[in-house]
A protein has these predicted regions:
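Acidic, metal-coordinating catalytic segment for phosphate/diphosphate chemistry
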Residues: 4-51
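Conserved Nudix-box catalytic region and its N-terminal flanking loop in Nudix hydrolases
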Residues: 2-5, 56-98
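Short connector loops at helix/strand junctions that flank enzyme active sites
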Residues: 30, 45-50, 70-72, 77, ...
């Protein structure tokens, strides 16, 4: 994906330690927000986002429709942010359960991508292949509808990286003739 060049737009203005003013200062390799009072450096790192790719028996992909916010009415592969103290696999299962009412088993990482579409919040997204082990789809949390879609009939998506990921899924599926993405045919790694 495209690298976002510096300088970054300043998002934080006060030191979290002492309340002093934060300003960008040049260090060896880049600008960093530095407290003018105590010298604290506020490192700006991407947040980890997690998403789970789930297909039904017909090989259709589960998507959720977002409610509220700037992506209202647009669809996405069910996703969320990892909590600071949360294991990445557990966090993925939790987010998926909150948004779709489905309990999943993680099979493997499908892809990892940088998300730069929101300048206020860069993330690293991890898309897992997963399969449903319990529950019926019901929208919750940030979603108001969940539905399965064939890969060639995907509705309007909220996030550019979901486009990339779905294109990868299409390629993988067509390369493997039938479907190696079907839950029963995904090799489980331990
Ligand atoms: Zn400070």
């Amino acid at each position: 994906m495209n690298y976002q060049p510096q300088p970054l737009t300043q998002r934080y203005f006060y030191c979290p330690l002492c309340g002093g003013a934060l300003k960008y200062q040049q260090y060896d390799e880049r600008l960093r927000l530095t407290c003018q009072q105590c010298g604290y450096i506020l490192y700006e790192n991407p947040i980890v986002g997690v998403a789970a790719i789930v297909f039904n028996e017909a090989g259709e992909l589960l998507l959720g429709r977002r409610k509220g916010g700037k992506y209202h009415g647009l669809w996405c592969i069910p996703c969320g942010y990892l909590e600071y103290d949360e294991d990445v696999y557990e966090g993925t299962k939790r987010e998926f359960r909150e948004e779709t009412n489905l309990t999943i088993e993680i099979i493997r990482v499908f892809t990892v991508q940088s998300n730069f579409h929101d300048p206020e919040r860069h993330t690293v997204g991890i898309w897992f292949l997963a399969k449903v082990i319990k529950g019926t789809p019901r929208a919750g949390d940030d979603l108001d509808l969940v539905e399965y879609f064939p890969l060639d009939k995907i509705p309007e998506l909220a996030f550019p990286t979901d486009h990339v990921v779905i294109e990868m899924l299409r390629r993988e599926r067509s390369a493997s003739g039938e479907s190696n993405l079907h839950p029963d045919r995904i090799p489980t790694t331990t």
